[in-house]
A protein has these predicted regions:
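Extended, helix-rich architectural segments
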Residues: 1-139, 453
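Short N-terminal secondary-structure initiator segments
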Residues: 1-49, 237-246, 271-298, 331-341, ...
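Short, hydrophobic/amphipathic alpha-helical patches that form generic packing surfaces
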Residues: 84-88, 126-130, 246-262, 416
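Short glycine/proline-rich turn/loop motifs
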Residues: 85, 97, 303-311, 438
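Short amphipathic alpha-helical segments
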Residues: 105, 109-117, 244, 248, ...
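Extended, regular secondary-structure scaffolds
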Residues: 121, 125-230
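Extended, charged amphipathic alpha-helical segments
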Residues: 211-345
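C-terminal helix-loop subdomains that flank or include functional centers
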Residues: 285-289, 294, 298, 312, ...
């Protein structure tokens, strides 16, 4: 693992030395365990179980040698549990957007920041670490599979990094080396295997204006007070959310595949032919072909034909699959909606079902908030983000509780609370404005009537 100090050792040397370091940096990054875990996380998130894909069934021949089984069924299915778990956490915490204390954060981070922070959260959960680049009022999100961080050995802060991308192995490798005082563009391709500078180092901010005296455009270059790329994690361990549940997902998928394979294999009917020992393999094949076509057979004398099938022991497999599914929800602290999807569920039961998810989201929220504060520091503004979690509620019970508290709550709070329960929080201000306008009109008419009298 290379650090910021390793980069400083070559930062002031010639470009060839720098490009050699950058190429080695990316190579080591791709060979690291964390990078491989990030790639696997993206595969599981996309519904591709890499463990199952690599799994090969074998059979043993008469010599006791293991050879690939190319005859029996070999289904390779993968559950999308990890996708559901990540989406659930992201949607519940960030689905309603971010509310700002004074509005400066929304102005500084851009109108689409709600979408960008959801992307950062998703990548952090899946890959273990995401990165947000504050690009002059716009946020760009990178994953661990496309950005090499260089942390300072002394204070632990991110001080530099290389963002890289390559469409295909036979296409050019593009690299943006990002430092405190600017960024440099490099490219590696078949004509330039050692790389070349595609764009010289330049500052992150370019301010252009026209001089009235000289009549020409003048540019001013600036940088940010801190490194404009900040890390984002999803948990205190700074690891992918896949790690603690991967083995359980593999077990679930493996048993599901075995279940399907057994059903497929057992669905085949095999035939027992009595008193026909003289039939060779060719005769047996001809017999089976006729059975498939005619569904009937002629037998002589004391010969007989009997169809047989195999019953799959499905009860034990269904039991273990059900147990593994419950274990997945428990270990991932996800909400099993089946617990609250049927019947009349009280608000207390809903809160109890949400408790594990809320506990996980408390830690997730702390990491997201830290990520946002780091971006605000780069932008040079101060604000406080808050979140409205998107959770299922018993609307009738909740609204009745609000109405029963009318004596101690003001009308604006009650309106906001009820509309949030109904899913219309974004329309609260419009309703409050219309009600205020109605009250003003009512007072105006009342004053007019008083003057007339």
């Amino acid at each position: 693992m290379k650090t910021y100090q390793d980069w400083l050792a070559v930062a002031d040397k010639d470009e060839n030395t720098r490009m050699q370091f950058i190429r080695q940096l990316i190579t080591e990054h791709k060979a690291s365990d964390k990078y491989k875990q990030a790639r696997d996380g993206e595969a599981y998130y996309a519904g591709q179980n890499v463990t199952i894909k690599r799994y090969q069934k074998f059979i043993y021949n008469k010599f006791g040698q293991a050879v690939p089984d190319l005859i029996s069924a070999n289904h390779k299915m993968a559950t999308r549990f990890f996708y559901r778990s990540v989406m659930q956490a992201n949607t519940v915490l960030l689905g309603n957007g971010i509310t700002w204390d004074n509005g400066e954060g929304a102005k500084a981070l851009g109108s689409d920041f709600d979408r960008k922070v959801m992307k950062a959260g998703r990548i952090a959960q899946v890959e273990g670490e995401a990165f947000g680049f504050f690009n002059n009022g716009k946020i760009e999100i990178y994953g661990y599979t496309e950005f090499v961080p260089l942390y300072d050995e002394e204070d632990g802060f991110l001080k530099a990094g290389a963002r890289f991308w390559q469409i295909d192995s036979n296409k050019p490798l593009r690299v943006t080396m990002m430092e405190l005082d600017g960024y440099t563009e490099y490219q590696y391709d078949k004509d330039h295997p050692d790389g070349f500078v595609k764009q010289e180092k330049r500052a992150y901010i370019t301010v252009k204006y026209v001089s009235e005296e000289l009549g020409e455009e003048i540019g001013e270059f600036r940088n940010y007070p801190t490194f404009p790329v900040v890390p984002c994690w999803a948990n205190e361990f700074k690891k992918s959310e896949l790690l603690p549940i991967r083995s359980t997902i593999d077990a679930f998928d493996l048993i599901s595949c075995k279940f399907a394979n057994n059903v497929s294999d057992a669905a085949l009917i095999y035939w027992t032919i009595t008193n026909a020992g003289g039939m060779d393999d060719a005769s047996l094949a001809e017999f089976l072909d006729k059975m498939r076509k005619l569904h009937a057979a002629n037998v002589d004398g004391d010969q007989s034909v009997q169809a047989n099938s195999v019953d799959v022991p499905h009860e034990s497999m269904e039991t273990i699959l059900d147990r593994l599914e419950k274990q997945l929800y428990k270990d991932s602290m996800a909400l099993d909606v089946d617990q609250i999807a049927s019947g009349a569920v009280t608000a207390t039961q809903i809160e109890a079902a949400y408790e594990p998810l809320n506990e996980k989201l408390d830690g997730y929220e702390a990491e997201i908030t830290d990520f946002i504060y780091r971006l605000l520091k780069v932008a040079g503004v101060e604000d406080k983000p808050t979140y409205t979690r998107s959770i299922m509620v018993n609307q009738t019970e909740t609204i009745n509780a609000v109405m029963n508290s009318a004596m101690v709550l003001d009308e604006d709070y009650m309106t906001e609370k009820i509309m949030t329960v109904l899913g219309d929080k974004d329309k609260v201000q419009d309703v409050l404005d219309r009600r205020a306008e109605t009250n003003i009109n009512r007072m105006s008419r009342g004053n007019a009537n008083t003057q007339t009298e």
